[in-house]
């Protein structure tokens, strides 16, 4: 009979051990779920930040590109018949003359 009680005692101890293990597994699962949720949130935030950075970098590149149009004041002076180049600045252009230096300055 004593052996039967020993078996019941061992089953009781095993049940307690299994309950403790199950509680530990449940705790680990909760921590893992929280970590996975946080990871997903951080990944989405990182992607949004990368998109914003890419937009910002595109804007910076656009700011750094030279203007397609020359300075309107220089165009006006040149159209009035004056040199705008460094060599002959403010000298009158001869009739029908075009100065390559002036044109280069305008369309640089």
From Swiss-Prot:
Belongs to the YabA family. It comes from the Bacteria. One of its GO terms (biological process) is DNA replication. Keywords: Cytoplasm, DNA replication, DNA replication inhibitor, Metal-binding, Zinc. Binds 1 zinc ion per subunit. GO terms for cellular component: nucleoid. Its cofactor is Zn(2+). Involved in control of chromosome replication initiation. Inhibits the cooperative binding of DnaA to the oriC region, thus negatively regulating initiation of chromosome replication. Inhibits the ability of DnaA-ATP to form a helix on DNA; does not disassemble preformed DnaA-DNA helices. Decreases the residence time of DnaA on the chromosome at its binding sites (oriC, replication forks and promoter-binding sites). Tethers DnaA to the replication machinery via the DNA polymerase beta sliding clamp subunit (dnaN). Zn(2+) binds at residues 83, 85, 99, 102. Homotetramer. Interacts with both DnaA and DnaN, acting as a bridge between these two proteins. It is found in: Cytoplasm, Nucleoid. InterPro entries: YabA (IPR010377). It comes from Lactococcus lactis subsp. cremoris (strain MG1363). The gene is yabA. This is Replication initiation control protein YabA.
């Amino acid at each position: 009979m004593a052996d039967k009680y020993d078996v019941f005692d061992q089953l009781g101890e095993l049940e307690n051990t299994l309950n403790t293990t199950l509680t530990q597994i449940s705790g680990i699962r909760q921590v893992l779920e929280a970590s996975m949720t946080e990871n997903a949130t951080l990944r989405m935030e990182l992607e949004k930040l990368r998109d914003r950075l890419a937009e910002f970098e595109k804007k910076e590149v656009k700011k750094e590109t030279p203007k397609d149009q020359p300075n309107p004041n220089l165009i006006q002076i040149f159209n009035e018949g004056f040199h705008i180049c460094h060599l002959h600045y403010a000298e009158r252009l001869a009739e029908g003359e075009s100065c390559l230096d002036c044109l280069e300055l305008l369309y640089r």
